[in-house]
Amino acid sequence: MRNSWIKPRLGQKNITQMNFAKNGIITEEMNYVAQKENLPSSLIMEEVARGRLIIPANINHVNLEPMAIGIASKCKVNANIGASPNASDINEEVEKLRLAVKYGADTVMDLSTGGVNLDEVRQAIIKESSVPIGTVPVYQALESVHGSIDRLTEDDFLHIIEKHCQQGVDYQTIHAGLLIEHLPKVKGRITGIVSRGGGILAQWMLHHFKQNPLYTRFDDICEIFKKYDCTFSLGDSLRPGCLHDASDDAQLAELKTLGELTRRAWAHNVQVMVEGPGHVPMDQIEFNVRKQMEECSEAPFYVLGPLVTDISPGYDHISSAIGAAMAGWYGTAMLCYVTPKEHLGLPNAEDVREGLIAYKIAAHAADIARHRAGARDRDDELSHARYTFDWNKQFELSLDPERAKQYHDETLPEEIFKKAEFCSMCGPKHCPMNSKISDETLDQLNNKLAKCDIKV
């Protein structure tokens, strides 16, 4: 779809959506996004230029269907997939991608760390995907030196970052905000550093006693991203891994650096979103969202959860969806899903489904709470179908039609029950929706009540 859009841009020094927007140019991607979001193209351009909205769209991801992440657009959901040294293969990861897109993932991150050829699995995912693909390049940087931190050089990081751009990765998590002077601040934590990328860079800095190379070479990374229109997802290496550690000095010190890096990327006209926690008590979620907006000049916020309890292994998709809905309501632009396997193991296809549906509910609830235009239309349509016992319409409008039909059919599987004015909960005699009272009857009652001087 995008070949004809991209061809005229080839050879230009800076082909980012932000660069075009700052120069008053509405790109085809901006027009496409405007139609999807039901917003004016001019507003999309203005928000991209301001940095409050991003369109992750690498020029080498030609089968991408552009989408927007930002405060002006609907709340989005990301799904993580990826092979590990102990589980999965390329075909399984591609199948997870298909399932993620089927159940509504707006973007997908390939977090593969081993067990397969990382280049091959990434290429297969990008080729198959119509949604933006994100990666964490430090994983492959470490894998490229067989896990030897002492052999990992600054140039190794940049080489892998450019390779991901060349392959068509739309956004990359760059853990540039973790500085060597931040490391002592984790001393009082229960769970220390829980970011894999942050852990790798912490080890690198301690071994070499040098500053984070992703920070010192940040402008070089910006130059790479300009050539491909790759977007920064600035990683939060010091995100809290438990409620005890939430909103501590370590997290907030890194957040301040992420704000600095956001503005440095914008000076290069490179798009940015900023990653956030993590594990956060409900009463601290609003503070975390507001603080990110303040420190990072309203760049789109992208949070993992946050989980609002630490005692829900096996059900962390529920614990985190509660926090995600609140974060979305307060203005978070994208929610990174959590599956039932969080903290326990590598998610399988069914875990991907469970996590995604939980997060589509959270994002949708946030859009309703923020009074997005048309956000509640589908809810109202389903409610009308429910009241008229249009079972097939109810299934169709559900976030997971297959699951809704499956649960209905467990007790009433015959086709005749798709027209029945009851389900197995109340049966044919006790469903309150069968006791329909006409508007005419209610008007007559209202008149009688008025004559009796009964206030209603």
Curated annotation (Swiss-Prot):
[4Fe-4S] cluster binds at residues 423, 426, 431. Keywords: 4Fe-4S, Iron, Iron-sulfur, Lyase, Metal-binding, S-adenosyl-L-methionine, Thiamine biosynthesis, Zinc. Zn(2+) binds at residues 279, 343. It catalyses: 5-amino-1-(5-phospho-beta-D-ribosyl)imidazole + S-adenosyl-L-methionine = 4-amino-2-methyl-5-(phosphooxymethyl)pyrimidine + CO + 5'-deoxyadenosine + formate + L-methionine + 3 H(+). InterPro entries: ThiC, ThiC/Bza_core_dom, ThiC/BzaA/B. One of its GO terms (cellular component) is cytosol. GO terms for biological process: thiamine biosynthetic process; thiamine diphosphate biosynthetic process. NCBIfam families: PRK09284.1, PRK13352.1, thiC. PANTHER family: PHOSPHOMETHYLPYRIMIDINE SYNTHASE, CHLOROPLASTIC (PTHR30557:SF1), THIAMINE BIOSYNTHESIS PROTEIN THIC (PTHR30557). This is Phosphomethylpyrimidine synthase.
